[in-house]
Amino acid sequence: MAVSVTPIRDTKWLTLEVCREFQRGTCSRPDTECKFAHPSKSCQVENGRVIACFDSLKGRCSRENCKYLHPPPHLKTQLEINGRNNLIQQKNMAMLAQQMQLANAMMPGAPLQPVPMFSVAPSLATSASAAFNPYLGPVSPSLVPAEILPTAPMLVTGNPGVPVPAAAAAAAQKLMRTDRLEVCREYQRGNCNRGENDCRFAHPADSTMIDTNDNTVTVCMDYIKGRCSREKCKYFHPPAHLQAKIKAAQYQVNQAAAAQAAATAAAMGIPQAVLPPLPKRPALEKTNGATAVFNTGIFQYQQALANMQLQQHTAFLPPGSILCMTPATSVDTHNICRTSD
């Protein structure tokens, strides 16, 4: 079944924040080192943001005074990553539309009804249900850019009468990723009087591993399992007390995800035996959490419901030819296969 998805012109992945210090004329970093944009006078700046030149990324901009930003190499790399993730989201949208039409074809009498779903930030990594719940996670509003949604993010379900429990959704929204630790701000200022093995925050030796957006570091899960063999690992190796904290948080998140899946299955009338077991947490790309591979189990609930309904309404057709099963008197009455004629 072919599905036509109109491509959406989205420039958000080309948008960069302008350096406020540069606008005041007090930025001490050059444009090749500052993590914010230093646009020229010809660039259009709106609300402290500037759009990068797509032709410049391809190395083919010939405009004399381009109104778009020509980013330096380090910002160009960031934009290229954003572009790849944007393509992944567009492909996921197309495949999601195909799955929706397939689910609608399986249940022609039950129209697809949108059900309110908890909102997800631009990163899948910030949604605990998307990261740890195999039933609700694949059908994530993060697969659809927020700017094309008319209202709050919605989850499409094949059962029009069953809503997703709002309490469970709100509880899952509060859960955070367990492979991140907050960096000690006192340690960053150089005046933390607690040692690395006593402070409840991370003390990373390398400042490059710190995510400046939320002041956190990503924990090396291989090190937690005792199998990291990298000579210079780009992830944080936490001390023993922080390892115990991470393991406890993972256990709590897994228990909450299992409880939420069970509650949703009970509300939708699906027995637990129909649902597959909980898999491991899917790997997420570090930049914005977009999954590189589309999950084929995106409509596990819908397919399970469809199978249950089809089993109830489908008539039994025994194998064999219809003529062979017709009584002999009926065949003679209708003059079928009579050699005397």
From Swiss-Prot:
**PROSITE patterns, per this entry?**
ZF_C3H1
SMART domains assigned to the protein according to its UniProt record, in alphabetical order: ZnF_C3H1 (SM00356)
Q: Which domain of life is it from?
A: Eukaryota
Q: Where in the cell is it found?
A: Nucleus; Cytoplasm; Cytoplasmic granule
Q: Which GO terms describe its cellular component?
A: cytoplasm; cytoplasmic stress granule; nucleus
Q: Which Pfam families match?
A: zf-CCCH, zf-CCCH_10, zf-CCCH_2
- Tissue specificity remark: Highly expressed in cardiac and skeletal muscle. Weakly expressed in heart and eye (at protein level).
A GO biological process of this protein is: alternative mRNA splicing, via spliceosome
Keywords, ordered alphabetically: Cytoplasm, Metal-binding, mRNA processing, mRNA splicing, Nucleus, Phosphoprotein, Repeat, RNA-binding, Zinc, Zinc-finger
Q: Which residues carry this modification: Phosphothreonine?
A: 6
Q: Name one GO molecular function term.
A: zinc ion binding
Please give the Gene3D superfamilies that the UniProt record associates with this protein: 3.30.1370.210
Q: Does the keyword Zinc-finger apply?
A: yes
Q: Which family does it belong to?
A: Belongs to the muscleblind family.
Q: What does this protein do?
A: Mediates pre-mRNA alternative splicing regulation. Acts either as activator or repressor of splicing on specific pre-mRNA targets. Inhibits cardiac troponin-T (TNNT2) pre-mRNA exon inclusion but induces insulin receptor (IR) pre-mRNA exon inclusion in muscle. Antagonizes the alternative splicing activity pattern of CELF proteins. Regulates the TNNT2 exon 5 skipping through competition with U2AF2. Inhibits the formation of the spliceosome A complex on intron 4 of TNNT2 pre-mRNA. Binds to the stem-loop structure within the polypyrimidine tract of TNNT2 intron 4 during spliceosome assembly.
User: Self-association or partners: how does it assemble?
Assistant: Interacts with DDX1 and YBX1. Interacts with HNRNPH1; the interaction in RNA-independent. Interacts with RBPMS; the interaction allows cooperative assembly of RNA-bound stable cell-specific alternative splicing regulatory complexes.
Q: Give the protein's recorded name.
A: Muscleblind-like protein 1
Q: Which organism is it from?
A: Mus musculus
Taxonomic classification: Eukaryota, Metazoa, Chordata, Craniata, Vertebrata
